[in-house]
Design a protein with these regions (language model features):
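Short linear interaction motifs
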Residues: 77-88
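Short, structured surface segments that line ligand/substrate-binding pockets
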Residues: 86-104, 109
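A mature extracytoplasmic/lumenal domain signature
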Residues: 64, 101, 110-115, 122
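Sec-dependent bacterial lipoprotein signal peptides
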Residues: 1-21
């Protein structure tokens, strides 16, 4: 009887640990960087085109982004992911894209700027975009908001 009680306690503990692990945002959208590497120049695209999941919005963190800004601090995510974002902002080689569902960061991906440079977007106006936002990439692989882009 004691053996079964211990076993059931271990199962409950394992279920709790797995549920916490499952709540952590994961880099599940890594296929997006691969797709962006092959993105046709001057052809409109959205990140939704490359994702198997459905999110409400995306938040783009460019190099040297100030993670003390209110717009970032208001995002619901784990401390571990916030820490990762803080580290990533120190590199000018990457941008981090957060995928948001129901006001919570559910996934992220790290994009090398040589593949797609989101840092060329005017972030003084906006960091948060609808998931189906259309972008366009120029010859230098700089990404622009499609509706604001002119060749």
């Amino acid at each position: 009887m004691e053996h079964y009680k211990l076993k059931s306690n271990l199962i409950v503990f394992a279920a709790i640990v797995l549920s916490f692990i499952g709540c952590e945002a994961k880099p599940t959208e890594s296929q997006i960087e691969l797709a962006l590497d092959k993105q046709v120049i001057e052809k409109p695209f959205s990140l939704k085109d490359y994702s198997e999941k459905d999110f409400d919005s995306i938040f783009i963190i460019y190099p040297y982004f100030d993670t003390n800004r209110k717009v970032f601090l208001n995002l619901r995510m784990s401390k571990k992911l916030k820490s990762l974002c803080n580290v990533n902002t120190g590199s000018e080689l990457i941008s981090t894209i957060l995928f948001i569902k129901n006001s919570r960061v559910e996934a992220y991906t790290i994009i090398e700027r040589k593949n797609a440079d989101f840092a060329s977007i005017d972030f003084e106006k906006q960091h948060l975009f609808p998931f189906d936002q259309k972008f366009i990439m120029d010859k230098e692989r700089d990404v622009h908001i499609h509706s604001l882009y002119s060749e």
